[in-house]
From Swiss-Prot:
Membrane topology: Peripheral membrane protein
Assembly mode: This protein is a subunit of a 75 kDa protein complex, which governs binding and entry of donor DNA. The complex is a tetramer of two subunits of the DNA-entry nuclease and two subunits of a competence-specific protein. Only the complex is able to bind ds- and ss-DNA.
Gene Ontology CC terms: plasma membrane
Main function: Plays a role in the competence of cells to be transformed. It inhibits the activity of the DNA-entry nuclease.
GO term, biological process aspect, one: establishment of competence for transformation
Keyword Cell membrane: yes
Pfam families per the UniProt record, alphabetical: ComJ
Name of the protein in question: DNA-entry nuclease inhibitor
Keywords carried by this UniProt record: Cell membrane, Competence, Membrane
Subcellular location(s) of the protein: Cell membrane
Coiled-coil segments on the chain, per record: none
Gene name of the record: nin
Length: 132
């Protein structure tokens, strides 16, 4: 299955946003020096990605997409397991975004595209989920 959702707006706070299981609460992440260096923190079925700025941003979520990202500032890839159908993405003081990602194992790649490089003229985080 290949799918791409429309970009959704998210207000970034505390320089992070979290991908987590549907119908759950995102855990509090421990941003160790190692996590900061890697650009993500993981805990309890969730991944928090580092955000460049606390600002309005767009999340573009894609499943098994072959589209390339030509201009980006940072790229982080992590394993992720979806326990039930669906995930949420939110930042600490933002609304919750929902995506109907099927249950299974994935490699999540988060591409950080700053506003000056983005077609949306705002910081954009492209998240590619690839089935493994």
């Amino acid at each position: 299955m290949i799918k791409s959702w429309k970009p959704q707006e998210l207000s970034i706070s505390y320089h992070q946003f979290t991908v987590f299981q549907k119908d759950s609460t995102p855990p509090v992440m421990d941003w160790t020096d190692e996590a900061i260096e890697k650009g993500y923190a993981a805990a309890d079925g969730a991944i928090s990605f580092e955000a460049q700025r606390n600002t309005k941003a767009f999340i573009l979520f894609r499943l098994n997409s072959s589209e390339t990202v030509n201009s980006y500032e940072k790229k982080v890839t992590v394993p992720f397991h979806v326990t039930e159908n669906g995930i949420h993405i939110e930042s600490i003081m933002s609304k919750r975004l929902s995506f109907d990602l099927p249950k299974g194992d994935y490699q999540l790649t988060c591409w950080t595209v700053p506003a000056e490089m983005s077609d949306l003229h705002a910081d954009t985080y492209i998240i590619d989920a690839v089935s493994v």
